[in-house]
From Swiss-Prot:
This is Ribulose bisphosphate carboxylase large chain. It comes from Ailanthus altissima. Keywords: Calvin cycle, Carbon dioxide fixation, Chloroplast, Disulfide bond, Lyase, Magnesium, Metal-binding, Methylation, Monooxygenase, Oxidoreductase, Photorespiration, Photosynthesis, Plastid. Heterohexadecamer of 8 large chains and 8 small chains; disulfide-linked. The disulfide link is formed within the large subunit homodimers. InterPro entries: RuBisCO, RuBisCo_large_chain_AS, RuBisCO_lsu_C, RuBisCO_lsu_C_sf, RuBisCO_lsu_fd_N, RuBisCO_lsu_N_sf, RuBisCO_lsuI. The modification N6-carboxylysine is found at K191. It catalyses: 2 (2R)-3-phosphoglycerate + 2 H(+) = D-ribulose 1,5-bisphosphate + CO2 + H2O; D-ribulose 1,5-bisphosphate + O2 = 2-phosphoglycolate + (2R)-3-phosphoglycerate + 2 H(+).
């Protein structure tokens, strides 16, 4: 057969509705908005082609390989209900297209070039199915939820954290002082803000030293294990590892990384270092909204969350749900399950397009953070359950009497909610009552309740997705 030059429709090669997916395929669900006049089959096939073996014209070297073995295939297309000219296109990629143990390569292939494609008006990656054959090539989360609880000796309740504010401008000594006050009051963790790296007003080494001092003092005082997420994110991988090494030398339990701005290559390196040296790793998702905010273009956060579980991290920020709509609650809980559980069934009502089997890759603790305070505690306890970290920045430091009383208020509220739940009370319905009862015994909690007046907890049933 002679080589036939020229441009031919993608759908002739890459749209294969009869294809039966293999267990080893990486499956992707894209939300495709084609340009006017482009049929959905052609758009879906174009996505499959450009993110695998295809290019815009037939090339002579196609004859030197087996396209059937290596091409991505668009095997199903369904219109999105309620949206005109939007389709979910399912694409199957053969496993051989990806380098083992590299999230970087996986994303370069699947979302690398194709998002700037002219035939598409918009494109969003909604979900990925990672086959066990691929996930087994990753180290994954460094320790997992059970190991973390054993390291910290904390069981049967969510963990409490607090981001130190003002995020920029404090000197190292004052920063350490704020950390000490929070930990002494009853928090498990305090946190560097994601943009605290090593700035002129507070260099990283000074901060690490003063925070370590705060950790050891508060541990001695309370008899509990304490931690501070020391942000090791830096301008180069070498500098990042240097900071992690220093944290290990100080004997602290946990460091932190901004995994999207730092990049997956750096994150995976840090995760490997931290597992080898017994450090927990807290992951912040700064920049995620640049990628996942738009409904019709970009990448859904559940994909970024799965990628993090492959790359490695022990905690990751996952939104709060509270005060938002029911639909968001279901979707958030969908990717929280993808982070924590071993086996997650396909469930379109929660935005889960594929059944995901993690084959005993350790889980990641979801972190609820952002605009939450003591009145939210019952809802947070009910929604996230024990395996989570609840982080109150302003909700601790904004307490009228200071940081330590703010920490006390949060800890008392949490313990009250956990106890009430264990006694069989309904936190969603009786939440305010539980907090009010607890505040009778805790002046710190009473003061916090007064500052952030009641928030209602009715969850109206909203339409999902």
């Amino acid at each position: 057969v002679g080589f036939k030059a020229g441009v031919k429709d993608y759908k002739l090669t890459y749209y294969t509705p009869e294809y039966v997916t293999k267990d080893t395929d990486i499956l992707a669900a894209f939300r495709v908005t084609p340009q006017p006049g482009v049929p959905p089959e052609e758009a879906g096939a174009a996505v499959a082609a450009e993110s695998s073996t295809g290019t815009w014209t037939t090339v002579w070297t196609d004859g030197l390989t087996s396209l059937d073995r290596y091409k991505g295939r668009c095997y199903n297309i369904e219109p999105v209900a309620g949206e005109e000219n939007q389709y979910i296109c399912y694409v199957a990629y053969p496993l051989d297209l990806f380098e083992e143990g590299s999230v970087t390569n996986m994303f370069t292939s699947i979302v690398g070039n194709v998002f700037g494609f002219k035939a598409l008006r918009a494109l969003r990656l909604e979900d990925l199915r990672i086959p066990p054959e691929y996930s087994k090539t990753f180290q994954g989360p460094l320790h997992g939820i059970q190991v973390e609880r054993d390291k910290l000796n904390k069981y049967g309740r969510p963990l409490l954290g607090c981001t130190i504010k003002p995020k920029l401008g404090l000197s190292a000594k004052n920063y350490g002082r704020a950390v000490y006050e929070c930990l002494r009051g009853g928090l498990d963790f305090t946190k560097d803000d994601e943009n605290v790296n090593s700035q002129p007003f507070m260099r990283w080494r000074d901060r690490f030293l003063f925070c370590a001092e705060a950790i050891y003092k508060s541990q001695a005082e309370t008899g509990e294990i304490k931690g501070h997420y020391l942000n090791a994110t830096a301008g180069t991988c070498e500098e990042m590892i240097k900071r992690a090494v220093f944290a290990r030398e100080l004997g602290v339990p946990i460091v932190m990384h901004d995994y999207l701005t730092g990049g997956f290559t750096a994150n995976t390196s840090l995760a490997h270092y931290c597992r080898d040296n017994g450090l927990l790793l807290h992951i912040h998702r700064a920049m995620h909204a640049v990628i996942d905010r738009q409904k019709n273009h970009g990448m859904h956060f559940r994909v970024l969350a799965k990628a993090l579980r492959l790359s490695g991290g022990d905690h990751i920020h996952a939104g709060t749900v509270v005060g938002k709509l029911e639909g968001e609650r279901d979707i958030t809980l969908g990717f929280v399950d993808l982070l924590r559980d071993d086996f997650i069934e396909k469930d379109r009502s929660r935005g889960i397009y594929f059944t995901q089997d993690w084959v005993s890759l350790p889980g990641v603790l979801p972190v609820a953070s952002g605009g939450i305070h003591v009145w939210h505690m019952p809802a947070l306890t009910e929604i996230f359950g024990d395996d989570s970290v609840l982080q109150f920045g302003g909700g601790t430091l904004g307490h009228p009497w200071g940081n330590a009383p703010g920490a006390v208020a949060n800890r008392v509220a949490l313990e009250a909610c956990v106890q009430a739940r264990n006694e069989g009370r309904d936190l969603a319905r009786e939440g305010n009552e539980i907090i009010r009862e607890a505040s009778k015994w805790s002046p710190e909690l009473a003061a916090a309740c007064e500052v952030w007046k009641e928030i209602k907890f009715e969850f109206p049933a909203m339409d999902t997705l």
